[in-house]
Regions:
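PEST-like, low-complexity acidic/proline-rich intrinsically disordered segments
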Residues: 1-26, 33
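Hydrophobic transmembrane alpha-helices of multi-pass solute transporters/permeases
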Residues: 2-5, 30-33, 38-124, 130-236, ...
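Flexible coil/linker segments and helix-coil junctions enriched in charged and small residues
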Residues: 242-243
Length: 622
C-alpha cells in the first residue's frame, strides 16, 4: 500500500469497521478510465474527494428505527446538500431554453405571416404572430413529434450513462448536441430563410431532431444526479430540540428534492415562455430561438465549475446485459404460447430461484452480484410496471402543448398573446409546490395518513381528468357562442373574428393540470430514483420519460380530431382515458402500495463488473 495515496488510506480505514461493509463497494474510490475521459476537466472524480462521501464513523452513531417506531414516529426531511441546488439551477436554464423555444412552435408552424412582416412579428393586438401557415394539424403533428422524440431519446442517454460514460459526461455531451440544435432553429427563423416556407420547415425539422437528441440525454441523467447528492439511504432516529424523537426519512427528503427540482423546472419554463412569446410578437421568431440559446450556455458553465464537488456513480459496464441474463434465467421453464398458462407460471415467486444463494456453487460465471442486487432489479421492474399507465396521463397533459394553445387563439384575448396563457400551468406549480411541501404533505403525515407515491399518482390521474372536463366544456361553448359556430379557426384566420368567451376561462384547465403534475409527474421522478438499482437509475428514469414519448405516439392517432368541428370530441376522449387510467392504475398497483417501506429499505447490494470473477473472490480481495 502506498501511504501517500489518500484513497487507499480511506479504504484501509473503512475495512477496519465491520459495520461499514455494506457501504464499501459504493464508497470505494473508483479508478479513472483514461479511454473514456473526454477532457481532464470532466473525468470521473474519486468518490472520496466528493462532498457527501462519508469517511468517518458518523453512521456508527446513528440509531435506526424499529418496526414499531416506523409505524408510530413522525417522519421528517433530512438536510439537502448545496450541490443539489446547483444542479437545480442547471435544470432551470435548460428548461428556460427548451420551453422558451417550444412555446412559439404552434404559431410558427400553424399561423400565416402577418401582412407587412418579414419575421413573423405583429404589433396588432387583434392578430396572432405566424410564419409558415401550415395549419393546426401540421402544428399538432410536429409538436407531438418533438415531444415524442425528446422523450424517446432518454433511453439512449441512459444506456450510455449507465454503461459507459457516467451521468456527468453524458450530460456534457448532450448539452453540446442541444446547443447545435438550438443554433439550427435560429437559422430557420431568420428573415432570409423564413420567407421560403419549405426550406424553413426543413431546417426547423433538422434542428428539432438534433435538439431532441441533446434534450433526451440530458433529461434521463440530470434528475438522478440531483438526488444522488443526498447520501443517506436508510431512515434513522433524530431527537429534536423540543425533545421529540422523529425519523429522518430519505424517501421524504428525495420527495422534497424533486418537488423543488420541479419548482425550478417551472420557473425556467414560465420565464422562458412569457419572455419568448413577447419576443415573437414584437421582434420575431428568430429572437425567440436566439435568447434561449444564450441562456443555455449557463448549463455547461455551472457544471464545469462544480465538477469536483458532485458525487458521481461510476458506470459499471454491461449492467443491462446482467439484468437481462438474470430475467432470462428466471423465465426458464415458464414460457408458453398460452397466455393463461404463461400468467399462471409466472405467478409463482419469480426471483427467489435465481438468487446466487439459491444456485450455490453452480451459479453461472456471469453472476457477479449478490441476492440483494436481484431484489433491486425486481424492484426496478415493478417501478417500470407502474409507469405503464402514464401514457394516459401525458395524453391529457400534452393538450396544453398544442390544442389548448390553438383554442386560446379562438377566444377573446384582450391583447394577451394566445401562447402566453398556458403559463398559468407553471405559475400554478410555482405557487402550489411550496404549499404541498410545507402544509399539505406534512399535515397529512401529522394526521397519520401515509400519502404514498401510488396514492399520489392515482390522484394525479383523477385531477388530470377533471382538467380535461373543463377543456371539453370550454370548447363546447366556443362553438356555441362563436360568430362562425364550429368553424372557429377558419373564422379567426379569414375574418379575424373570435368567440366572446374570455381566454382567462382556461385558467381552471391549467391550474388543475399543475396540481395533477404535483401528484403524478413529480412522483414519477421520485419513484424512478428510489426504486431503481443504484447502477441502473438512468434507465429506469428513461423508462418513466419514455411513457411521454409513447403518449405522443398515441396522440398522433387523435390528430384527426384536432380540427374544427371535432375538437369537443378530442377533449372528451382524452377525459375518458384519463379516468380509465386512474382506475386501472390503482387496481394494478394497490398491492405494491402496501410494500412501500419494505421496498425503500432493501439491504445494500454488492455488484462487480468483472466478468468471470465471483463475488466471493471480489470480496476476498477487499
Amino acid at each position: 500500500m502506498n501511504p501517500s495515496d489518500p484513497s487507499e488510506t480511506v479504504e484501509v480505514a473503512k475495512a477496519t469497521a465491520n459495520l461499514h461493509d455494506a457501504h464499501l463497494n459504493e464508497k470505494k474510490a473508483p479508478s479513472i478510465d483514461k479511454d473514456l475521459a473526454i477532457t481532464p476537466s470532466i473525468e470521473e472524480v474519486p468518490a472520496t474527494t466528493v462532498i457527501g462521501a462519508t469517511t468517518d464513523d458518523t453512521d456508527l452513531q446513528k440509531t435506526y428505527p424499529t418496526d414499531e417506531e416506523l409505524r408510530t414516529l413522525r417522519r421528517v426531511c433530512g438536510q439537502i446538500p448545496w450541490t443539489s441546488y446547483t444542479v437545480a439551477f442547471v435544470e432551470l436554464c435548460e428548461r428556460f431554453s427548451y420551453y422558451g423555444t417550444t412555446a412559439v412552435f404552434v404559431n410558427f408552424i400553424q399561423r400565416p405571416m402577418p401582412a407587412g412582416s418579414s419575421t413573423g412579428a405583429t404589433y396588432d393586438s387583434s392578430r396572432v404572430p405566424g410564419a409558415l401557415d401550415m395549419g393546426q394539424q401540421a402544428s399538432t403533428g410536429l409538436t407531438l413529434f418533438n415531444s415524442f422524440w425528446s422523450y424517446i431519446m432518454p433511453t439512449a442517454g441512459a444506456f450510455v450513462a449507465d454503461q459507459y460514460l457516467g451521468r456527468f459526461r453524458t450530460i456534457m455531451y448532450s448539452i453540446a448536441a442541444a446547443l447545435l440544435g438550438h443554433l439550427i432553429l435560429v437559422i430557420s427563423a431568420i428573415p432570409s430563410v423564413i420567407s421560403h416556407p419549405q426550406g424553413a420547415i426543413a431546417c426547423f425539422s433538422i434542428g428539432l431532431i438534433i435538439m431532441g437528441v441533446g434534450t433526451g440525454g440530458f433529461k434521463s441523467n440530470i434528475s438522478p444526479l440531483i438526488a444522488e447528492q443526498y447520501r443517506e439511504e436508510y431512515p434513522y432516529i433524530k431527537t429534536l430540540a423540543s425533545g421529540e424523537r422523529v425519523i429522518v426519512d430519505p424517501a421524504i427528503t428525495i420527495q422534497r428534492i424533486y418537488l423543488y427540482y420541479y419548482l425550478t423546472v417551472n420557473i425556467g419554463s414560465i420565464t422562458g415562455q412569457v419572455s419568448m412569446v413577447y419576443a415573437e410578437r414584437y421582434v420575431g421568431f428568430w429572437l425567440s430561438y436566439f435568447l434561449p440559446t444564450c441562456l443555455f450556455l449557463w448549463c455547461p458553465t455551472v457544471l464545469f465549475f462544480c465538477r469536483n464537488k458532485y458525487y458521481r456513480v461510476k458506470p459499471q459496464g454491461s449492467v443491462y446485459g446482467q439484468a437481462f441474463r438474470l430475467w432470462k434465467l428466471a423465465m426458464k421453464g415458464r414460457w408458453s404460447l398460452n397466455p393463461v398458462r404463461l400468467f399462471k407460471r409466472n405467478d409463482k415467486p419469480f426471483w427467489e430461484s435465481v438468487k446466487p444463494s439459491a444456485l450455490g456453487p453452480n451459479r453461472p460465471q456471469w453472476m457477479t452480484f449478490d441476492d440483494e442486487w436481484v431484489d433491486e432489479v425486481a424492484r426496478g421492474l415493478k417501478a417500470c410496471k407502474v409507469f405503464l399507465w402514464y401514457p394516459l396521463f401525458w395524453l391529457a397533459y400534452n393538450q396544453m402543448l398544442n390544442n389548448l394553445t390553438s383554442q386560446a387563439a379562438t377566444m377573446h384575448l384582450g391583447g394577451v398573446p394566445n401562447d402566453i396563457i398556458n403559463n398559468l400551468n407553471p405559475l400554478a406549480l410555482i405557487i402550489c409546490i411550496p404549499i404541498f411541501d410545507r402544509v399539505i404533505y406534512p399535515g397529512l403525515r401529522h394526521l397519520g395518513f401515509n400519502f404514498t407515491p401510488i396514492k399520489r399518482i392515482t390522484c394525479g390521474f383523477v385531477v388530470a381528468g377533471c382538467s380535461m372536463i373543463a377543456a371539453t366544456v370550454i370548447q363546447h361553448y366556443i362553438y356555441v357562442k362563436g360568430p362562425c359556430g364550429k368553424e372557429a379557426n377558419y373564422c379567426l384566420d379569414e375574418y379575424g373574428k373570435y368567440s366572446p368567451i374570455s381566454v382567462w376561462t382556461q385558467a381552471i384547465i391549467y391550474i388543475l393540470g399543475g396540481i395533477s403534475e404535483i401528484f403524478a409527474s413529480i412522483t414519477s421522478l421520485e419513484y424512478a430514483f428510489t426504486k431503481a438499482p443504484k447502477n441502473m437509475r438512468s434507465i429506469v428514469q428513461a423508462v418513466a420519460l419514455f411513457m411521454n414519448a409513447f403518449s405522443s405516439a398515441i396522440g398522433q392517432a387523435f390528430v384527426g380530431l384536432s380540427k374544427d368541428p371535432l375538437l369537443v370530441y378530442n377533449y372528451m376522449v382524452v377525459t375518458i382515458l384519463a379516468f380509465v387510467g386512474a382506475i386501472g392504475f390503482w387496481l394494478s398497483n394497490y398491492k405494491l402500495d402496501r410494500r412501500e417501506d419494505e421496498l425503500n429499505n432493501l439491504p445494500q447490494s454488492k455488484y462487480t463488473e468483472k466478468s468471470g470473477v465471483s463475488l466471493d473472490e471480489e470480496n476476498a480481495r477487499k
